[in-house]
Each structure stands twice: as C-alpha cells, then as structure tokens.
Amino acid sequence: MEDIKEKVLETLASLGMTGWGLTPADHDGFTCAATLFLAYQLPPETDPLAGGSYDEATFHNTLIAVRDRGLQMLQPLYEVLDEAGVRHWTVPSGQDPDTLEAPFSAKRAAALAGLGWTGKCSLLVTPRNGPRVVLFNVLMDLEGAGAPTTLRPACGTCTACIDACPQGYLTGAEWRDGIDRAQVIDAFACSSRMEMLGKPIGHKHSCGLCLLACPLGARKATNH
C-alpha cells in the first residue's frame, strides 16, 4: 500500500495543477481526499482589479474552460488508481438545490489540506491566487493521508469582497470552524438572485463580483 501511495503522490505532483494536497476523509467509505486547484485570470478589460468592467459571459466561460481542462488533467491519476485497484470518485460540481450544500465540501477539504482558508466571501481563498481558483476533489480508498494542516485566515481588516457585493449578502463575519453559514453569507438570497439574473442567458448567473474583488487575485495566474 505504501508503494501505491508513493505512486499517487508522484502522479499528483506531475499533473500540472496550480496546487494540491491530501487530507483524511470519511465519506461513503473513502478514507482520503486529494484536493487540487487551477488558478485563472481574466482579460484585463473584464478584470475589475485591472480596471476593467465585469462581464458575465467571459467569467462564466473562463470557469467552464478551466474546469474542463482540469478534469482532463486528472486522467493520469485515474489510470494509476485503476491499475492499483484503488476505488475513487471525483466529486461533481454543484449543490443540492434545497440545502445549497455539496455532497462533499471541496472548500473544507482544501482548507484541511493547507491550501487556503475560507474567506469573508465564504469561498476558499488561497495565499497566492486568492479565490480565483477552480477546485477538484478526488476521494480515494487510500490510507496514509496524514494529519490535516490548516492555514490561519489572512483576510485581516480587508472588506473588498463585502464592498463588491451590490446586494449586501456578505455580513463581514470571519469564517471559523463550526460557524453557521448564515452568519457569513445569505446563501439562499444570493443563489436566488443568480438564478433570476441567469434566466435571460440560459444558465445560472455565475456572478464573480465578490471573488474578483479580492486583492490576492491580482497575482499572476496562467489559464490552463
């Protein structure tokens, strides 16, 4: 099993993702979660941090393209796991419409893997790319993930994401383990508005205003 773990670690490191980490998991019999992310940037003309004007289509299409690219990049990992007979499952994107919760929290797994922290925008914030990342989670029946490693939130007194939300859905509370989501964000109001705005364009509005305002996102990232 140790040889398999080493092969998995080597493969994860070779995929070309912006960042990745392992953390123990306890979900549907899986014991380990590999959390990976790709960082992205927008064209200057549609990037608020570069003086541009937010464009929904550009933001949405960027997310789709980066997600599709990331899923393709995971193929070598699947091959290694399949060859070793290790059961695995890639957590799909999306949430339960009634609870607005995912079947497995990619954000929490990423935080436990030491990749970032949950910011005042209720999204994962990474030290180098802020919240401008697309997350991927592969759950595996693999032992030896190691103890969780968490980062202290580094948002400090920054309120950029809060100020960027035109509806005031962010409260300004700093996320901490065990806090009720409603104390940080009115998730249902936010989701309802994104659905309303999305009707004319045929998909739920992606609305990246809060995450694109994070000053950490100004660091250079390469779209894959």
Each language-model region and where it sits:
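Catalytic cores of enzyme domains
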Residues: 59, 65-224
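Non-catalytic, usually N-terminal nucleic-acid engagement modules in DNA/RNA processing proteins
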Residues: 1-68
